[in-house]
């Protein structure tokens, strides 16, 4: 690599590194993901996202005003062709505590699920159960997963289109049994930034041989849709994520999130909101039911039809 290219490489890496660290730090602070004395079980798959997550968390660990542990964990599901030597060699160089769990969930899924049927549900349950159980065994207080902002948005649309739910991936989650807290430190990070960062840092990426399941095909379709939107309307993805952080249950239709049934008017409420902001003089209201007129203030009456006629 020439000196000029090396300088550009370093400059770009430093700039990207600062941005990602800032975004991870903001997500951690906003959702109180990491607290003093935490033992973080950092789940590694060998992909770009989990490598970046571990790298950034280890850097923050050195700079943070609080003390927390990091333990890297990989689940070897015995998928054919998985290079078992890559992660141990990498983690040894980092001098980070780690565990490689071996559980042949691949064979279980192949045995239980008929050919051609989606394996995602069973596979994710087995993986989640193994990781949750191991977290409790080592006394981990938080489980860190490498999902990023794009994953969160894609999951929202997947659930909307194919599940009929407004549901995504929360940056922080309490497991159903209440025993584990899951955090997603990359929640504010863009996938394209993580991909570039992984290339610049030369992480030993383990290729992901996708199973070709229906869920993965659907996710790919949603990703293509969002990428097309982003090309056509730059900034739309950022706006979608901002909208997810600014929900208004009272302006929706979900009766579980807002008590529409009990809504009643307050006859003594002061004039405010839309009525107060309108600041229009009084005018005649047409009483359709009685074909009559209700005079409010004859002195300030205006002809509403003529005034607003186009």
UniProtKB/Swiss-Prot annotation:
UniProt GO molecular function: 4 iron, 4 sulfur cluster binding; ATP binding; magnesium ion binding; sulfurtransferase activity; tRNA binding
Ranges annotated as spanning the membrane: none
Cofactor remark from the record: Binds 1 [4Fe-4S] cluster per subunit. The cluster is chelated by three Cys residues, the fourth Fe has a free coordination site that may bind a sulfur atom transferred from the persulfide of IscS.
UniProt-listed Enzyme Commission number(s): 2.8.1.-
Binding site for [4Fe-4S] cluster: 120, 123, 211
Enzyme class label: transferase
Protein's cellular compartments: Cytoplasm
Locus of motif PP-loop motif: 45-50
Annotated metabolic or biological route of this protein: tRNA modification
Biological process annotations from GO: tRNA thio-modification
Keywords attached to this entry: 4Fe-4S, ATP-binding, Cytoplasm, Iron, Iron-sulfur, Magnesium, Metal-binding, Nucleotide-binding, RNA-binding, Transferase, tRNA processing, tRNA-binding
Cofactor(s) this protein cannot do without: Mg(2+); [4Fe-4S] cluster
Pfam families documented for this protein: ATP_bind_3 (PF01171)
Family (UniProt): Belongs to the TtcA family.
Database matches in HAMAP family: TtcA
Extra remark beyond the main annotation: The thiolation reaction likely consists of two steps: a first activation step by ATP to form an adenylated intermediate of the target base of tRNA, and a second nucleophilic substitution step of the sulfur (S) atom supplied by the hydrosulfide attached to the Fe-S cluster.
General function of this protein: Catalyzes the ATP-dependent 2-thiolation of cytidine in position 32 of tRNA, to form 2-thiocytidine (s(2)C32). The sulfur atoms are provided by the cysteine/cysteine desulfurase (IscS) system.
Quaternary context: Homodimer.
Full protein name: tRNA-cytidine(32) 2-sulfurtransferase
Organism: Shewanella baltica (strain OS195)
